A protein has these predicted regions:
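Catalytic-core signal marking the mid-to-C-terminal active-site face
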Residues: 155-251
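Phosphate-binding chemistry for phosphorylated carbohydrates and sugar-nucleotides
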Residues: 1-158, 171
Length: 251
């Protein structure tokens, strides 16, 4: 068995997710390095999400954990067909999954949509970057502990560190900018915004993605750009966000 050191495990009814867990993993990062631990595991308040921290203090997100679970299934000789991510799943995850010989599909953001697509395709593995992972061959919903145990079992079986295990997946730099909406218009229909998106996609030349989507909970447009060149990605995201902001103010 493993020696386990727990932190953030003193609930008082008010401190759920307060500076701890998968939504605030900074303290876990520090503790892993201080203790010289092999890894750290962070759950959110209701336990359906999980992130990990490797021995160097690097955060391992839901995309990387889902990739490891897919690898573990293949190493056990299981036929899983494919993996479902979302519109926000890192492009590096998609490429890594396909390199394993698996299909990959994207659902809308939200675990309910991941589950719907899994059922549609008859697959068993899907999840979000936030660490909400669904393994229908193990449980019927997202369960952080179940997901974590599968990763830990795979690391033990392969006798490999978490850091080395995720080395097979190269995450693309990703920039997200939230642009507040001012009125009732739709900036995404603006000709200037659409032109900025087209120009960005041309510069990425098939090795990146541009995504604009309205927030489901706030009056925001989320601008996401990812690609191989971090400086270019940042520049393109800011250019598009500026056009969205201009269009929002004019609406």
């Amino acid at each position: 068995g493993a020696e386990v050191i727990t932190i953030g495990d003193k609930p008082d009814g008010l401190n759920i997710n307060l500076d701890c867990g998968s939504t605030h993993p900074e303290h876990l990062v520090t503790r892993v390095k201080v203790e010289g631990a092999d890894l750290g595991v962070a759950f959110d308040g209701d336990g359906d999400r999980v992130l990990m921290v490797d021995h160097q203090g690097e955060i391992v997100d839901g995309d990387e954990l889902l990739y490891l679970i897919a690898r573990s299934r293949l190493s056990d000789g299981e036929d899983i067909g494919g993996v479902v991510g979302t519109l926000m799943t890192n492009l590096g995850m998609e490429l890594a999954v396909k390199s394993l010989g698996l299909d990959f599909a994207r659902s809308k953001v939200g675990d309910r949509y991941v589950l719907e697509m899994l059922n549609e395709k008859g697959w068993t593995l899907g999840g979000e970057s936030s660490g909400h992972i669904i393994c229908l061959d193990r449980t019927t919903t997202g369960d952080g502990i179940v997901s974590a145990l599968q990763v830990l079992a795979y690391l033990a079986k392969e006798n490999i560190s978490l850091h080395d295990a995720v080395g097979g997946m190269n995450k693309f730099p990703q920039v997200m900018i939230n642009v507040p909406l001012q009125g009732s218009g739709d900036p995404m229909q603006s000709a200037a915004v659409q032109q900025a998106v087209e120009q960005a996609e041309a510069k990425l030349d098939g090795r990146g993605r541009v995504l604009l989507r309205p927030s489901g909970t706030e009056p925001l447009i989320r601008v996401m750009v990812e690609g191989e060149d971090e400086l270019l990605v940042s520049q393109l995201a800011n250019d598009i966000a500026a056009q969205v902001e201009n269009a929002a103010q004019a609406a």
